């Protein structure tokens, strides 16, 4: 049974995130002791609450972040602060894919990127979870959205999410997109660049960012952590900004709660629709 501020949840759905894969390889910053159960986040129904839980009750439909592991299970105990009411506009599968991706996008574009209406946003890895969330949020904020990726067929889907333009990052196995981005932004470059990829994509990004632009470092899905020639941000007047959405909320709980509330309010407008490409039973 849950004690203190714990909440016992019957898991309805759990999502697979890139950090789950990294944890199995020992490459993620959070390194749980072996053995452990995978699963960073999910959705479900509260079964019981601890004796000091205030804002949640039995029967509530919720999303949860399990502090790194444990979501791939039938039941899970999670501290109250990691549990939020499920947006009514989302089903359980969509809700299981909601928290990490959309919170990352919100903290990146709004809190750290200071995205303004009408600005151009270059979203790398746009066909992945955090990229999809960024495309949808940027469009909700009335920005010009340029989505990038390595598969043209997958990129076409991003138009449904709000992408105004799609750009392949690779041309014959060479990362080359700077000229296309400049053409789409009247030679200026993107005002905000959202980069969960790193590597060669980062190297090319610093060549197509606008004066005063914000390059948001979200992750390194390419496998290579890049280094930047610091004369570039000096000459072009842009900022390189690191984003850790979870840590942002832990260090400033008030703003963290505001962020969580904001993404739920936007979800209820219908602007956020997590795309589920495949579902598996827990036995699989």
Positions of predicted regions on the chain:
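Glycine-rich phosphate-binding loop and adjacent beta-alpha segment
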Residues: 149, 158, 200-272
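Short, well-ordered loop/turn sites that connect or cap secondary structure elements
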Residues: 56-57, 115, 209
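Hydrophobic/small residue at the entry helix of a nucleotide-binding pocket
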Residues: 104, 129-130, 200
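Adenosine-nucleotide cofactor-binding segment
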Residues: 139-201, 252-258
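NAD(P)H dinucleotide-binding glycine-rich loop of Rossmann-like/cofactor-binding domains
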Residues: 22, 64-125, 172
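Glycine-rich beta-strand-centered segment in the early N-terminal region that forms part
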Residues: 1-16, 27-70
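Short glycine-centered segments of the SAM/dcSAM-binding site in methyltransferase folds
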Residues: 61, 120, 144, 213-214, ...
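N-terminal Rossmann NAD(P)H-binding glycine-rich loop of SDR-like oxidoreductase domains
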Residues: 127, 135
